[in-house]
């Protein structure tokens, strides 16, 4: 069993991205499953090309993409990805798509096929705040989530996949006012228990 877990590079002036910093701290194996860790560029299109290459190369059974969500206070297990790019800020190569479909031949939306409620339950059992989210936004996170589910629908039909948003880490909010954050250790543990939840699904 292989689980591919991806995070993103920093963006929008941040020096770190807790999604990848937390992934780096995950063990190399969970419940006997090999954990493959990778960093995606915070760039429309390029992120999806790299994700597809990773899936083709590693042939994982499960893919969990992780991203940073400013303003979130909990580990957010995303339910649905929508077929739209509508950026409020530039990506890391200056792209700022507005009201553009991600794939013209894709569905309007795709749902995660991970056991999202079981993932939330498993995380919360270890006293880490978690929730189901019904919006992954319209930036690169939703772009990658939608692209993953599109690839599962069109190409990698036996693959399980989904997306998790994590809060800022504490050191990112030292100069920000009233912005929620979570320790990198808790973010890492939240991802660990999310993976355990997926692997425990009967």
UniProtKB/Swiss-Prot annotation:
GO molecular function: pyroglutamyl-peptidase activity
The keyword Iron is annotated on this UniProt entry: no
Keyword Hydrolase: yes
Gene Ontology biological-process annotations: proteolysis
Active-site feature positions: 78, 141, 165
Catalyzed reactions per annotation: Release of an N-terminal pyroglutamyl group from a polypeptide, the second amino acid generally not being Pro
Role noted for this protein: Removes 5-oxoproline from various penultimate amino acid residues except L-proline.
Quaternary structure and partners: Homotetramer.
Entry protein name: Pyrrolidone-carboxylate peptidase
Species for this entry: Thermosipho melanesiensis (strain DSM 12029 / CIP 104789 / BI429)
Gene: pcp
């Amino acid at each position: 069993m292989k689980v591919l877990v991806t995070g993103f590079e920093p963006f929008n002036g941040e020096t770190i991205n807790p999604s990848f910093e937390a992934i780096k701290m995950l063990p190399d194996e969970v419940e006997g499953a090999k954990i493959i860790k990778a960093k995606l560029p915070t760039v429309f299109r390029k992120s999806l090309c790299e994700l597809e290459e990773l899936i083709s190369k590693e042939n994982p059974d499960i893919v969990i993409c992780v991203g940073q969500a400013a303003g979130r206070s909990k580990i957010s297990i995303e339910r649905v990805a929508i077929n739209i790019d509508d950026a409020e800020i530039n990506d890391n190569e200056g792209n700022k798509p507005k009201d553009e479909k991600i794939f013209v031949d894709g569905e309007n939306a795709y749902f995660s096929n991970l056991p999202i409620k079981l993932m939330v339950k498993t995380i919360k059992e270890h006293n880490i705040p978690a929730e189901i989210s019904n919006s992954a936004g319209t930036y690169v996170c939703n772009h990658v989530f939608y692209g993953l589910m599109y690839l599962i629908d069109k190409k990698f039909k036996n693959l399980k996949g989904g997306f998790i948003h994590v809060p800022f880490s504490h050191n990112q909010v030292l100069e920000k006012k009233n912005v929620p954050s979570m320790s990198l250790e808790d973010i890492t543990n939240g991802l660990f228990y999310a993976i355990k939840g997926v692997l425990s699904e009967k």
